[in-house]
Amino acid sequence: MVRGMRTIPPMRSESLAFLRTLLDTPSPSGFERDGQRKWLEYVRANGATRTWNDAYGNCFAELAPTVAPAAGAAPFTVAVCGHADEIGLMVNHVDSNGFVYCRQIGGIDPASIVGKRLQFRSSVPGVTQPVIGLIGATAIHLQDRSGEPKVRKLHELFVDIGAKDEAAARARLNIGDPGTFLDASMMLTDDIIVARALDNRIGTWVAAETLRLCAQQAERRVRVVAVSTVQEEVGLHGAEMIAESLRPDVALVTDVGHATDSPGITQAQHGQFKMGNGPKIAIGGAMQPEVVARLLATADRLSIPLQRGATPGSSGTDTDAIFLAGGGIPCGLVSLPIRYMHTTVEMGALSDLERIPQVYAGFCEGLTGGERFAPTL
């Protein structure tokens, strides 16, 4: 393996194996079951005192405080959240020649998926293995090049599963079957990882790793609940559900953010964020200022660099749903800077990623359980 520019010890092998298991388990929005099962297995083996899930598959792992709250008082609850789902496609139509047409699950640039391989989870009785297909591309020799190049829309792209006709295709796939891109995770260097679903399997990984680190603390006065939410890519739906049911005192959310250090990105417009220079902390908008200040202080105490990101409005993450619940839940958002978001080659640095649960665990350890995150007016 090519050596990168890692300045901290290598990631714990069990943690890296768990991350790659999450990354390589198909979990499109609305069909997160397989990935959620892997997540629950890990948290149950790494400190959770209780786990549960709701009707839509949001998963929770609780770690009770080591110091009980005062008699009759409910424990101060910190929710550490990330969404489990990824973008993908859903079977929408099968034509007479057996070609499959799809609708998108989440935000997809059609130009980025031509020629890509897919795996569909079939609901046809008796079909137990993934159905493999590819998004067909007309050979360059056969293209009409007389006018301007045509940018094809998603509904114009077809998936070829090797079926000879409509009946053969429908014997293997039903309308509504979900598909994900067939791209496994890989290490580009000893620090740089590439995967189709860093967005946002890294968020659920952070939640589980924070729980694991907190379980090792000698004393902790707060209840920590790691949460793996569903359906973020199609509307933050899981976050709305868990905010209403859990009502934490504080929520720490992790998602991916844009690294702006690759060609073609205007930093004056999008900010300056470099992969490998530390996680990105959001400032403004849904982020509660006292929570942000404590996260920054915790990172400083632990000598962990954070890149500040201006977020005056929507963050485009689960934070936007959680902070509105229950009259306002104080939130913080720390993201992993990645390149090539919403493609099959999302790229990030492990050295950035593993610092996020370290900050969160330090944040939880420093709480007394009596905090009230609100401005002094």
Language-model region placement:
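N-terminal hydrophobic/helix-forming segments and targeting peptides
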Residues: 1-377
